[in-house]
Amino acid sequence: EEREKIGTPNLSELTLEQLKKLTEFNGKKFTKLPIEVQTKFRLSNIKVTTLSDKSDKQVRFDLFERLNRGGVTLTDQEIRSCVYRGGFNNFIKELAKNQDFIECVHLTERQENDGTREELVLRFFAYLYDLKSFVHSVRDFLNDYMEKADEKFNYSKSEKIFCEVFKTLNAALPKGISKGRKNTPLNLYEAVAVGAALAYLKNETINTEGIEEWIKDSELIKYTTGATNTKERVIKRIEYCKDKFEG
């Protein structure tokens, strides 16, 4: 009786649709389901945890991550999209649709659907504008930057830089940012994209002469393989590419 009191009053009016496993229930209302199924549903507990908008965002991220255990696990960027909502989040989602960026950065089918492309836009601006704050944890660095960026961010200037960088790279790299592989290595992406942006900020131009050769250079490979997320290696690979783009 108590369950009925707090239950969904119009449950009998709902019709099941698009079930892929229990297809025999498609088109049926709750009252037409087998009694044992109805009973199991009514007796099932649903755990609800409320994440307050007033909570510290890092706390919300950590709690969201702990709750994210069953079913399809969300990626860090999918969680960020839920926690750090606002203008900057919307901005990186829009830039992720940039055609030059899509053609230049090749991802797996799974990555195309799990927020990876949006995270790469986030990485671009985080390393471009706030590299000094990076220590070792990429996840924490991106979380911190996503929160900071929403407070004050020059959207028009940043969009211009992003579009110019990937327009130039797409023209210079018909096979995309790669070392002969089908998909773009994320560390190489950071080095090339951010290095190009830094060169553009300094000279308002990006020299791509010889890029298809030096992108496979042994020195750059050294900085983009192995323990690649040390601050020293992140800085060295970005500076290596910046120097090349400056000519």
Language-model segments: residues:
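Acidic, carboxylate-rich catalytic segments that either coordinate divalent cations
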Residues: 210-247
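Small-residue-rich helix-loop
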Residues: 134-177, 181, 188
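Eukaryote-specific, cytoplasm-facing alpha-helical/coiled-coil scaffolding segments in long proteins
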Residues: 91-92, 147-153, 194, 218-224
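C-terminal hydrophobic structural anchor segments
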Residues: 166-220
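Short alpha-helical "patches" and their helix-cap loops
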Residues: 78-82, 134-150, 203-220
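Short amphipathic alpha-helix initiation/capping segments at coil-to-helix junctions
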Residues: 56, 114, 155-162, 181-189, ...
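Basic- and aromatic-enriched surface patches that contact anionic nucleotides/nucleic acids
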Residues: 1-139, 220-228, 246
